[in-house]
Amino acid sequence: MFEARNSAVPVAGTLKIDYQPDRLRLTRPNDKEGSPEMKRTSPTRRDLLATAAAATAVSMAEVAPAAAQAGPKPIFPVPMVTIPIVGESQVFQVRRIYCIGRNYAAHAIERGSDPNREPPFFFQKPTDAIQNVAVGEVADHPYPSLTKNYHHEVELVAALKSGGTNIPADKALDHVYGYALGLDMTRRDLQNGMAAEKKPWEIGKSFDHAAVLGPIHPASKTGHFEKGAISLAINGTVKQSSDLSKMIWSVAEQIAKLSEAFELKAGDIIYSGTPENVGPVVKGDVLLCKLEGLPDMSIKIV
């Protein structure tokens, strides 16, 4: 069944279906109201079959959108997590957050690991752990629950526009959309406690606001970051200071290694590791993060 509408649809190149609310009429293209041709018009079997086919097509066209709308719907909406892009009205939708651990030799040593080129390890944070910080803003960052030893870790973050599996390192940067400055905030006492018990330490890394992030800068404008000064200061005193060239695994190598274990996709972001001298923050501290080639990022612990 279909509902008649006020419309005219060509049929088989010779007839026209004229839909009216109270009737369905066939006419030929050159027929005029009241003309002899119109009075003599008598639909043939071919005309009637074409009419039925057209009516079915109209019916299906009207029913399809309704059927789609009638499909399963979420019981409640879940907000989409996005990151602003500098110079763009569009935003970057986040799919997953990957983080690499101990990717600077000096930081590996201070965390009790071998600084040699051992295989990298990764962990994840929930996408809704992101706290966006605008350029020029000093954003309030809440001191989290359960910890008495809250640490800063400043990092370069890569944002992917595409992905795949087993990506060669020499092709990996082709998948990078852009870069941002980030903070991997850590409840160090909880992380260390779980590590001592040989248990997963998500509670120390994966919590609300744990992924602080500046806006994304397209790589088409900044180029790729393989070297450059990176630092963090607390209340004007520099605490972390290093260079991206001191990474054990480059961003390209991280992407290649990750793609061996996971299918990477557009929307994935990668925290590329922090240099040495991570340390605690307390309420009232103002953190200033710097990365050569990107605007500064700042938060206040509240």
PLM features: residue spans?
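Catalytic-pocket segment enriched in acidic/His residues
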Residues: 70-91, 107, 135-137, 188-302
